[in-house]
Amino acid sequence: MSDQTMAGRTVLVTGASDGIGAETALVLAAKGATVHVTGRSADKLRPVAEAVGTEPLIADFSRLDDVRRLADQVAERVETLDLLMNNAGGTFAPSRRTHDGHEPNFQVNHLAPFLLTNLLHPKLSSAGTSLVVNTSSIGNLMGKIVLDDLDYDHRRAIEFPAYGSGKLMNIVFTRGITQRWSDDGVVSVAVHPGPVGSSFGRDSWFVGLLYRSPLKRLVTISVPDGAAPLIALAERGPDPEINGRYFSRFNANGRENKQARDQSIIDGLWERSAALVELT
């Protein structure tokens, strides 16, 4: 019999159609958790949902109305939410705006999970203690948050720096949750899973080219290896000692951009993001 370290816990994993999201969902379900999964591809998500024993939740994070509908569906399904794994994301060519008119790396990597997490705050807080895990990246080091131009309206968006900025925002958002929701029992942590050889860059021609080349084996780790840090954090649960931390795989002191601890950035990103998604 497999260990049941996650028994009794209710989990939502985003970006669970494949890669580390799917792997994390499958392992946590095997460990006894009730796991709900969401992704944008119905065909790819369906077998994952069947394997964990729940109905698939289809949502495209480039459409904020999908995110709002997803939050409503989750709220209907669960009384409480013990663990939210914000794993959806990737690299995107910035030349094409989202359905909502935002730069895609900004919306998919930050704005959509920011909205979802806020909408699910009542379910997280009603659990007594809960954990939010935000999948970030070492790419945060090449990011830069410009509070007056989050959407690249007045500067050129370049794919990898824009992706890095989104991953930096994941860490900053983690710190914002820590400062605002700790009294509600919500613990938040960000994690770089490692350079995983999955489909996260499928919308990027450059990453797609790299991942189709022999170099992939030299520069990436396997999906199970990439999922391992997420699973370890899930099993650790809402430990106050990790609140607000940024892990580089299993290292609790991952290298992070200096903006990640700038209080004006932490407050400003939250306030501007809330305004953009019309949270009151």
Model segments located where?
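Rossmann-fold NAD(P)H-dependent dehydrogenase/reductase core
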Residues: 1-199, 277-280
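Hydrophobic alpha-helix feature that most strongly marks membrane-spanning transmembrane helices
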Residues: 182, 205, 235-238
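Short, flexible, mixed-charge acidic loops at enzyme active sites
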Residues: 145-151, 203-207, 247
